[in-house]
Amino acid sequence: MNTGAEAVETAIKLCRKWSYLKKGIPENQAKIIVCDNNFHGRTTTIVSFSSDPDAYSDYGPFTPGFIRIPYDDLPALEKALEDPNVAGFLVEPIQGEAGVYVPADGYLSRAAELCKARNVLFIADEVQTGIARTGRLLACDHESVKPDILILGKAISGGLYPVSAVLADDDIMLVIKPGQHGSTFGGNPVGAKVAMAALEVVKDEKLAERAENLGHVLRRELRAINSPMITLVRGRGLLNAIVIKPTNGREAWDVCLEMKENGLLAKPTHGDKIRFAPPLVITEEQLMECVEIIGKSIATFC
């Protein structure tokens, strides 16, 4: 496919078709569990299960067939899985748009186990977290989890060309027969070659290891900024965020505007959080320059 949203839509279709043909769920009764504060794209079906008014307002009527539960809440997942018509659990290993919310250790592995016990597909949306961003090739690798369906995009082509992908074993993937699904530019030779080259660079230049090491540096230096405006630093690898406490009438948006004036681009998400996802090829020197700008910009308001 081309975009992350298109890949998510494909995964939803694949999951539903599998549930009817393999699991035996009655026709048109399949449900997919999703999480509060999710972000999986902007198509009508995907915004149908969003909890963000900015994403779904005025776009109804919405697509049915989704159960939304709190993120990082295993008891809630276990309860939702009691429904015999649940076909899949669609989850971000780290919620990026929500403000880089990293779940508790063991959440993903236990969630995958619960899904397996109920014959429910564990679907990992790694469009934001995949391809070395979090310090592993996949964020699921931090807990040695192999998803039943894996969704990739963005970095799979190094940001050069629109490429996305859905991966699954044959038992799942082959429920869709030739002619039952397609994408105008999906699988085109240029896109495929670009993705292959990008993955070779990730491997050869050890970008996952770089992200892991530089992520520790970034979080350490951000925590060293002495400012009451920064109430929390969190992240994994080179996917990080700070939580901003409004101070003297200034908020996260004002901090971003000041950073722009000082030479660094970032944006707030969910109001009080600023996300930092620098290029995986960033040097430590450049990273320290970014931290200096962040500290200088925040100091303007305190």
Predicted region positions:
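Conserved N-terminal phosphate-binding loop of PLP-dependent enzymes in the Aspartate aminotransferase
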Residues: 1-302
